[in-house]
Regions:
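Canonical Rossmann dinucleotide-binding motif of NAD(H)/NADP(H)-dependent dehydrogenases/reductases
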Residues: 1-13
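Conserved glycine-rich Rossmann-like NAD(P)H-binding loop of the short-chain dehydrogenase/reductase
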Residues: 10-24
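Substrate-binding pocket helix/loop in short-chain dehydrogenase/reductase
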Residues: 82-84, 88-93
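Active-site loop immediately N-terminal to the catalytic Tyr-X3-Lys motif
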Residues: 85, 131-137, 159-160
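Active-site helix of classical SDR
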Residues: 107, 142, 150
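Alpha-helical segment proximal to the catalytic Tyr-Lys
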Residues: 112, 155-159
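Residue(s) in the substrate-gating loop at a strand-loop-helix junction
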Residues: 126
Length: 182
Protein backbone atom coordinates (compact mmCIF):
# COMPACT_ATOMS: atom_id res chain seq x y z
CA UNK A 1 0.00 0.00 0.00
CA UNK A 2 2.79 2.40 0.93
CA UNK A 3 4.58 1.62 -2.32
CA UNK A 4 1.45 2.32 -4.38
CA UNK A 5 1.05 5.74 -2.78
CA UNK A 6 4.79 6.46 -3.02
CA UNK A 7 4.69 5.70 -6.76
CA UNK A 8 2.05 8.44 -7.06
CA UNK A 9 4.32 10.91 -5.22
CA UNK A 10 2.54 10.92 -1.87
CA UNK A 11 4.49 11.68 1.28
CA UNK A 12 3.81 9.06 3.94
CA UNK A 13 3.50 8.52 7.66
CA UNK A 14 4.23 4.89 8.49
CA UNK A 15 3.48 3.46 11.91
CA UNK A 16 4.37 0.13 13.42
CA UNK A 17 5.92 -1.60 16.38
CA UNK A 18 9.27 -2.48 14.82
CA UNK A 19 11.60 0.52 14.50
CA UNK A 20 14.02 -1.28 12.18
CA UNK A 21 11.28 -2.23 9.71
CA UNK A 22 10.01 1.36 9.73
CA UNK A 23 13.53 2.72 9.15
CA UNK A 24 14.16 0.26 6.33
CA UNK A 25 10.86 1.16 4.65
CA UNK A 26 11.61 4.88 4.99
CA UNK A 27 15.04 4.54 3.38
CA UNK A 28 13.78 2.37 0.53
CA UNK A 29 10.71 4.47 -0.30
CA UNK A 30 12.52 7.81 -0.10
CA UNK A 31 15.40 6.57 -2.25
CA UNK A 32 13.26 4.86 -4.85
CA UNK A 33 10.42 7.40 -5.18
CA UNK A 34 11.85 10.74 -4.00
CA UNK A 35 9.16 11.26 -1.38
CA UNK A 36 9.34 12.06 2.33
CA UNK A 37 8.48 9.35 4.85
CA UNK A 38 7.84 9.94 8.55
CA UNK A 39 8.29 6.67 10.46
CA UNK A 40 6.65 6.62 13.91
CA UNK A 41 6.80 3.75 16.34
CA UNK A 42 3.29 3.27 17.72
CA UNK A 43 1.53 0.31 19.28
CA UNK A 44 -2.14 0.40 20.21
CA UNK A 45 -2.49 -2.29 22.86
CA UNK A 46 -4.33 -3.20 26.06
CA UNK A 47 -3.17 -1.22 29.06
CA UNK A 48 -1.62 1.62 27.06
CA UNK A 49 -2.71 5.25 26.81
CA UNK A 50 -3.80 4.61 23.25
CA UNK A 51 -5.44 7.96 22.62
CA UNK A 52 -2.20 9.72 23.60
CA UNK A 53 -0.16 7.36 21.40
CA UNK A 54 -2.37 8.08 18.39
CA UNK A 55 -2.54 11.82 19.11
CA UNK A 56 1.27 11.85 19.10
CA UNK A 57 1.35 10.21 15.66
CA UNK A 58 -1.21 12.66 14.27
CA UNK A 59 0.63 15.64 15.80
CA UNK A 60 3.89 14.51 14.19
CA UNK A 61 2.11 14.07 10.85
CA UNK A 62 0.63 17.58 11.00
CA UNK A 63 3.91 19.11 12.23
CA UNK A 64 5.80 17.43 9.37
CA UNK A 65 3.36 17.66 6.46
CA UNK A 66 0.75 20.23 7.55
CA UNK A 67 -2.21 18.12 6.44
CA UNK A 68 -3.74 14.66 6.26
CA UNK A 69 -5.36 13.64 2.98
CA UNK A 70 -5.73 9.89 3.40
CA UNK A 71 -5.88 7.62 6.43
CA UNK A 72 -5.30 3.92 5.84
CA UNK A 73 -5.92 1.51 8.70
CA UNK A 74 -4.33 -1.80 7.78
CA UNK A 75 -2.56 -2.92 10.97
CA UNK A 76 -3.62 -6.11 12.68
CA UNK A 77 -1.93 -8.57 15.00
CA UNK A 78 -3.60 -11.75 16.19
CA UNK A 79 -3.11 -15.31 17.36
CA UNK A 80 -4.04 -17.34 14.30
CA UNK A 81 -5.18 -20.94 14.48
CA UNK A 82 -6.43 -20.72 18.07
CA UNK A 83 -10.00 -21.92 18.58
CA UNK A 84 -12.55 -19.94 20.57
CA UNK A 85 -12.38 -22.49 23.40
CA UNK A 86 -8.61 -22.12 23.62
CA UNK A 87 -8.38 -18.35 23.11
CA UNK A 88 -7.09 -16.29 26.02
CA UNK A 89 -8.30 -12.81 26.88
CA UNK A 90 -4.82 -11.52 26.09
CA UNK A 91 -4.93 -13.05 22.61
CA UNK A 92 -8.37 -11.60 21.99
CA UNK A 93 -7.26 -8.18 23.26
CA UNK A 94 -4.25 -8.24 20.92
CA UNK A 95 -6.51 -8.50 17.88
CA UNK A 96 -9.17 -6.08 19.07
CA UNK A 97 -6.73 -3.41 20.20
CA UNK A 98 -4.33 -3.63 17.24
CA UNK A 99 -7.19 -3.68 14.74
CA UNK A 100 -10.53 -2.29 15.87
CA UNK A 101 -9.38 0.11 18.58
CA UNK A 102 -6.49 1.34 16.46
CA UNK A 103 -8.85 2.13 13.56
CA UNK A 104 -11.23 3.91 15.95
CA UNK A 105 -8.52 6.02 17.60
CA UNK A 106 -6.87 6.99 14.31
CA UNK A 107 -10.19 7.86 12.69
CA UNK A 108 -11.23 9.97 15.67
CA UNK A 109 -7.88 11.80 15.82
CA UNK A 110 -7.65 12.39 12.06
CA UNK A 111 -11.26 13.49 11.59
CA UNK A 112 -10.73 17.28 11.88
CA UNK A 113 -7.83 17.16 9.41
CA UNK A 114 -9.69 14.93 6.96
CA UNK A 115 -12.63 17.33 7.18
CA UNK A 116 -10.31 20.22 6.23
CA UNK A 117 -8.90 18.40 3.21
CA UNK A 118 -12.10 16.54 2.30
CA UNK A 119 -9.94 13.47 2.52
CA UNK A 120 -10.43 9.73 2.54
CA UNK A 121 -10.33 6.83 4.95
CA UNK A 122 -9.51 3.35 3.72
CA UNK A 123 -9.97 0.63 6.31
CA UNK A 124 -9.06 -2.99 5.82
CA UNK A 125 -11.26 -5.84 7.01
CA UNK A 126 -11.08 -9.45 5.87
CA UNK A 127 -12.89 -12.37 4.39
CA UNK A 128 -12.11 -14.17 7.66
CA UNK A 129 -14.99 -12.34 9.26
CA UNK A 130 -17.31 -12.81 6.33
CA UNK A 131 -16.74 -16.57 6.19
CA UNK A 132 -16.00 -17.40 9.82
CA UNK A 133 -12.58 -18.93 9.23
CA UNK A 134 -11.58 -21.65 11.68
CA UNK A 135 -9.16 -20.50 14.37
CA UNK A 136 -9.65 -16.82 13.54
CA UNK A 137 -12.16 -15.71 16.19
CA UNK A 138 -10.35 -12.62 17.51
CA UNK A 139 -9.08 -11.57 14.09
CA UNK A 140 -12.53 -12.00 12.54
CA UNK A 141 -14.23 -10.16 15.41
CA UNK A 142 -11.85 -7.21 15.08
CA UNK A 143 -12.22 -7.07 11.31
CA UNK A 144 -16.02 -7.28 11.48
CA UNK A 145 -15.94 -4.45 14.02
CA UNK A 146 -13.88 -2.42 11.57
CA UNK A 147 -16.47 -3.08 8.86
CA UNK A 148 -19.23 -1.74 11.12
CA UNK A 149 -17.17 1.27 12.20
CA UNK A 150 -16.46 2.06 8.56
CA UNK A 151 -20.13 1.94 7.57
CA UNK A 152 -21.05 4.30 10.41
CA UNK A 153 -18.23 6.71 9.55
CA UNK A 154 -19.29 6.72 5.90
CA UNK A 155 -22.79 7.72 6.99
CA UNK A 156 -21.68 10.33 9.53
CA UNK A 157 -18.77 11.84 7.62
CA UNK A 158 -20.26 11.93 4.13
CA UNK A 159 -21.79 15.34 4.88
CA UNK A 160 -18.25 16.57 5.59
CA UNK A 161 -17.11 15.30 2.18
CA UNK A 162 -14.89 12.63 3.73
CA UNK A 163 -14.88 9.46 1.64
CA UNK A 164 -14.82 6.36 3.87
CA UNK A 165 -14.41 2.87 2.39
CA UNK A 166 -13.62 -0.65 3.44
CA UNK A 167 -11.51 -3.22 1.61
CA UNK A 168 -12.12 -6.88 2.45
CA UNK A 169 -9.39 -9.02 0.89
CA UNK A 170 -10.30 -12.67 0.61
CA UNK A 171 -8.03 -15.65 0.90
CA UNK A 172 -9.07 -18.73 -1.05
CA UNK A 173 -11.03 -20.92 1.35
CA UNK A 174 -12.95 -24.17 1.22
CA UNK A 175 -16.16 -22.11 1.38
CA UNK A 176 -15.16 -20.18 -1.75
CA UNK A 177 -14.26 -23.42 -3.48
CA UNK A 178 -17.72 -24.81 -2.69
CA UNK A 179 -19.34 -21.57 -3.87
CA UNK A 180 -17.41 -21.75 -7.14
CA UNK A 181 -18.58 -25.33 -7.72
CA UNK A 182 -22.24 -24.47 -6.99
Amino acid sequence: IATAYAKEGANLVLTGRNVQKLTDAKEELEKKYGIKVLPVQADVSAGSDNEAIVQNVVKQAIDTFGRIDVLINNAQASASGVTIADHTTEQFDLAVYSGLYAAFYYMKACYPYLKETQGSVINFASGAGLFGNYGQCAYAAAKEGIRGLTRVAATEWGRDHINVNIVCPLAWTAQLEQFQKA
